[in-house]
Amino acid sequence: MKGNEFRNQTQTTIKNELAEWSDNSNNSQVDYASNAPSGDHVLVDWDGPNDPKNPKNWPHSAFLIHTILVSMLCLAGNLATTMYAPGAAQLAVEFKTRDTTTIALTVSIYLLGFALAPMVTSPLSEVYGRLIVYHTSNIFFLGFNLACAFSSNIGMFIAFRFLAGCAGSAPMTVGGGTIADFAASPEKNNTALRLFALGPLLGPVIGPIVGGFVAENIGWRWTFRIMSIVIAVLSILSCIFLRETSAAAILGRRGARITKETGKPFMIPGPMPGMPPKPQQPTKEIVSRSLVRPMKMLIFLPQVLILSFYTAFVFGLIYLLFTTFPAVFEGQYGFSPGVSGLSYIGIGFGMVGALFLFNFINMKMSNRTDKHGQLIPESYLPLMTWFSPLLPIGFFWYGWSADKQTHWVVPILGTFFVGFGSFAIIMPTTAYLVYAQGPQGAASVLAASNMMRYVFAAFLPLAGQNMYDQLGLGWGNSLLGFLCVVLAPVPAIFQRYGHYLRERFPTEF
């Protein structure tokens, strides 16, 4: 397979996998042999190339509506990750707790839901379709956010906060697949997927800016009430405008009717071009594969384990800062809860800058192929090698400038380098893992990487405030910077020896 062909085939997968798109999402070119027998099975396909039930034939307005709604749902789920953070101190006073670990947990436990829930929602969307996952998760997301708003003790709050994270992660899990189901032109599809990807990028930055002023003026509970209003509006719009777009689900229901009428089992087209049709798999088998295969990759593929650990550690550091910014800027600079939310702007601009640079360099360097014409996954790693040193520089800058109480803009400028350096690591690593595993392993490797990433984001922040209390802002952030320095050679090592690890430990699950 030539490099460009491989890249085009796999690029759909990587972008869809931003939301952990399941292995069996349909992105295939069908051969329109509807109801043609195949051995003991009936092949269920579209009724010709113009079948109106096929999302690829829906009008462009449907594509726009689904893209906007799914992107808004994804943004809402990510807004909730940190929107409440500036109000955590108010919750601590109301519930009479002074334990900094518990206070940090009220923010970060939400992300544990992002780590665990996709292992269930992804296979469920494969079996029952994407639409039911959206509607069900929206209802639970609304209910659990309201439960957070009316919690009467901290234990109840933490429990409902975790469940809200489980429900809020669903649009990220299946949203990219919804956009890809339409198979619009590459330009429109890329634009839509970039819009969808802004949710995980901007949500955690915009959330505390809004939440800070809400908490300051009307209290921390209103951050959840306002979030619930947003979710309710989006849920109503979803019920009105969203339709099932998964080809596997639509054809599966058509096949179920045929099986009921004829008694014969059915098959649907393969999930990727050139793949043979396959029979409907049992739900138990699909769920088992979604749970087991990512774990096998982490255990048996050192390249997956090492890079997943690296990005998870970096991602956890970002959320350590997110959970401690209010205490740092309120304590060191006397910011109000509302103004302290603005301290997230620096890291947000850094992330956006890294995103644009990655897209630019990606276009310049991702066409590199080996002597066999195959894409070289290591071609995505130079950005990480060049800019990963910015991460420890950012921590040293932020820590000592805040410790010495220089002008508040100086530590915020330091967080810009943290945001830039962290995303200069996370994005190339994600691309490398997906292209190194190929289309058939992309879903599982991203499920494994994302699970580890959100576990670190949930638990690493718990040590943040205690670390600052013991070491101070200067040496506390220097400790984080030194750990980043220790890990800094990882990109260069994989750029040099990544091909050897891929050959020595191939994906064979």
Curated annotation (Swiss-Prot):
Positions annotated with a glycan in the UniProt record: 8, 26, 189, 367
| Chief localization | membrane
Q: Name one GO cellular component term.
A: plasma membrane
Give GO MF terms, alphabetically.
transmembrane transporter activity
Subcellular localization: Cell membrane
Alphabetical list of CDD domains matching this protein: MFS_Tpo1_MDR_like
Q: Which InterPro entries match?
A: MFS (IPR011701), MFS_dom (IPR020846), MFS_trans_sf (IPR036259)
Keyword field: Cell membrane, Glycoprotein, Membrane, Transmembrane, Transmembrane helix
Q: Which residues cross the membrane?
A: 63-83, 103-123, 139-159, 162-182, 195-215, 222-242, 298-318, 341-361, 380-400, 408-428, 442-462, 474-494
Instruction: Please verify whether the record's keywords include Lipoprotein.
Output: no
Membrane topology value:
Multi-pass membrane protein
The protein's matches in Pfam families, at most eight in alphabetical order, are given as: MFS_1
Task: Please list the disulfide bridges.
Answer: none
Q: What does this protein's UniProt record list under function?
A: Efflux pump that might be required for efficient secretion of fusaridione A or other secondary metabolies produced by the fusaridione A gene cluster.
Q: Which family does it belong to?
A: Belongs to the major facilitator superfamily.
Q: What is this protein called?
A: MFS transporter fsdG
The organism is Fusarium heterosporum
The UniProt gene name for this protein comes to: fsdG
